[in-house]
Amino acid sequence: DIGITGNLKGQEEIALGETLRKAALSTNQGHEAIMQGVNTLVAQGMGASEAGQYASLLGKTATATNADMNDLAKMMYSLSNSLEIKGEANLKEALNRAAYGAKLGQFELKAMAQSLPTLTSLFAAKGIKGQEALTQIIASLEVGRGASGTDGEAVTNLVNWMSSMNRDNTTKAYEKAGVDYQKSMQNLVAKGYSTRATWPSRTPPAASIG
């Protein structure tokens, strides 16, 4: 129950219930599905009132992409919490980026929604946040999917790569080859490249979640 989980008072719970019903009707989603998405946001740590504001966006995205509502909610929370993409307008832009990237490539948004919570945490830990971080993740997954052949392998390869960044053994390996790893990374970033050192900064156009 959202009212209990989110510590809502009577009138607040009534207002939230009305918001969820309107979101369900306007997005062609069932009331239970919308409630599940908002409940997931609250369970992840978002305030109930704030989570309710995203009910319509969750519904529109689920309808447009056929992604699982629970996965979408976890994805949305990770975008907000890990990458610090805050507010409905910015989250809508982020979801549009993800949908557009999925449409262009082979890595569908349904699979992306399942993997993003882990990947956003890894990128955030490296100080890579915001819409640019999401663009890097999407591009990496799409290229990785084409190279590996499966969604799972693409995610695993990216996780392994991110986990190895800045490790002592990585830095030492570059030093043995006569390369200052940290300085090289800083130079690439200064020239407009991502911390992954392979992806130039690019911003895909918006998609059409609604």
Regions found by a protein language model. Give the residues of each.
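A short, terminal or domain-edge coil/loop segment
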Residues: 84-88, 122-127, 164-170, 207-210
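Cationic, amphipathic, low-complexity alpha-helical segments enriched
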Residues: 195-209
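A short, structural motif
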Residues: 1-74, 81-93, 102-113, 126-131, ...
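Alpha-helical scaffold elements adjacent to nucleotide-binding pockets in ATP/GTP-utilizing enzyme cores
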Residues: 75, 94-97, 136, 157
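Extended amphipathic alpha-helical segments with heptad-repeat/coiled-coil character used for oligomerization
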Residues: 107-115, 125-199
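Amphipathic alpha-helical scaffolding segments
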Residues: 57, 77-78, 159-162
